[in-house]
């Protein structure tokens, strides 16, 4: 097996960009949603969807303790799907936000990670297709051995629409050739000439996706992605008209589902997480290539996974783990034939670092989690 080079597919890349951007907008949303509070009821009704199938009472965010948000990017490429939220979760990023250290950590999870689902094995991203956000969250909780506080789900339509809603952005093509992806997509003729130009949403997708012509490869592409995100945030913060914010809210509400109630009660609290974006670090759970029955998987190394688990736990201010517990099929498990011990997820009440509910949420009444030790026993 070879170590994966993390060659992200185009949908995963674009959804990742949109996911990070929406988290940024949420974190500065204390002001945005506050100044347009008349729109918050519509935004709440369109975007709020709790982790369980039936809605719980809205939660009040407290920006005093670390929290995490699972970002799910849904593949909406099949035009025959009647529901734009159907499909696999082709992008999965755990965002860990610590307002005390003013730090945000983005942990990307490979969609093809080889997982054990009890009676069968399959890819990580198939969990969403079987049980949508509830199944995806439960699966990733077992993978990382942590409690996930909230989720945020986006679809592919969002990034281009959002760039257009802010009136386009200005970027600089430092190459001596136009940035284009027409060699991969012959019907996509959008390009960005050398130099500084104002680009629209369709061009922003191209600018963020090009990799093969970049001498720095994926690293160069990531720099352009960060440039796009930064420019959009700068445009959002520069607006002095409520109509601009209204357009942005409409764009978000049409392309996002989240367990975080975006209402006026949470608006000022969300603002408390803004400074956590000052320092953003990125982690990647990678694997080794494995081909089984013509299907390609990524098999994670147990030590690498344990290191990722503990990096997340450090940002959540939880004790370090010395033993790996996971539902992933690791390299060691394949070599020895010994299945990994899974965390006990039958009981999982809200941890101290979750948003505080207005009243007891019944969906957790039969669940238990060792909040002192910070892991499942």
Enumerate the predicted regions with their spans.
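Soluble non-cytosolic domains of exported or imported proteins
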Residues: 85-89, 118, 127-134, 153-157, ...
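Entry/capping segment at the start of metal-dependent catalytic domains
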Residues: 2-101, 287
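Second-shell loop/turn segments in exported
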Residues: 79-83, 122-130, 145-150, 194, ...
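Extracytoplasmic
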Residues: 64-67, 87-92, 101-109, 119, ...
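Flexible, polar/acidic helix-loop-strand segments at domain edges
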Residues: 60, 64, 164-243
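C-terminal solvent-exposed extensions
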Residues: 51-52, 56-57, 119, 257-377
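Amphipathic, coiled-coil-like alpha-helical scaffolding segments used for oligomerization/assembly
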Residues: 127-190, 259
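Extracytoplasmic/secreted envelope proteins and their assembly/folding machinery
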Residues: 91, 121, 125, 133-141, ...
């Amino acid at each position: 097996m070879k170590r994966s080079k993390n060659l992200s597919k185009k949908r995963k890349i674009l959804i990742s960009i949109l996911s990070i951007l929406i988290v940024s907008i949420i974190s500065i949303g204390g002001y945005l949603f506050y100044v347009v509070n008349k729109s918050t009821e519509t935004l709440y009704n369109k975007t709020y969807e709790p982790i369980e199938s039936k809605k719980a009472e809205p939660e009040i965010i407290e920006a005093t303790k670390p929290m995490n948000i699972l970002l799910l990017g849904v593949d909406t490429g099949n035009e025959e799907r009647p529901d734009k939220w159907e499909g696999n979760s082709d992008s999965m990023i755990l965002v860990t936000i610590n307002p005390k250290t003013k730090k945000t950590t983005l942990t990307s999870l490979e969609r093809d990670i080889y997982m054990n689902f009890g009676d069968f094995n399959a890819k990580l991203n198939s969990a969403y297709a079987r049980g949508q956000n509830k199944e995806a969250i439960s699966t990733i909780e077992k993978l990382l051995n942590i409690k996930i506080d909230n989720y945020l789900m986006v679809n592919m339509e969002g990034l281009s629409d959002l760039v257009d809603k802010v009136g386009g952005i200005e970027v600089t093509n430092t190459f001596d050739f136009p940035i284009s992806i027409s060699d991969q997509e012959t019907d996509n003729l959008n390009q960005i000439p050398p130099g500084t130009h104002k680009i629209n949403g369709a061009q922003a997708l191209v600018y963020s996706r090009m990799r093969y012509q970049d001498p720095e490869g994926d690293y160069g592409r990531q720099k352009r992605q960060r440039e796009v995100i930064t420019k959009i945030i700068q445009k959002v913060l520069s607006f002095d008209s409520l109509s601009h914010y209204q357009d942005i809210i409409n764009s978000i509400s049409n392309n996002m589902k989240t367990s975080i109630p975006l209402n006026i009660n949470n608006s000022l609290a969300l603002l408390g997480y803004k400074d956590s974006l000052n320092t953003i670090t990125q982690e990647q759970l990678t694997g080794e290539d494995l081909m089984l029955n013509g299907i390609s998987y990524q098999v994670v190394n147990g030590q690498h996974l344990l290191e990722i688990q503990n990096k997340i736990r450090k940002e959540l201010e939880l004790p370090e783990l010395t033993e790996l517990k996971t539902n992933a099929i690791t390299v060691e498990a394949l070599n020895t034939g010994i299945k990994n011990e899974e965390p006990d997820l039958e009981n999982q009440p809200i941890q101290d670092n979750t948003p505080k509910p207005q009243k007891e949420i019944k969906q957790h009444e039969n669940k238990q989690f060792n909040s002192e030790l910070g892991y499942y026993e």
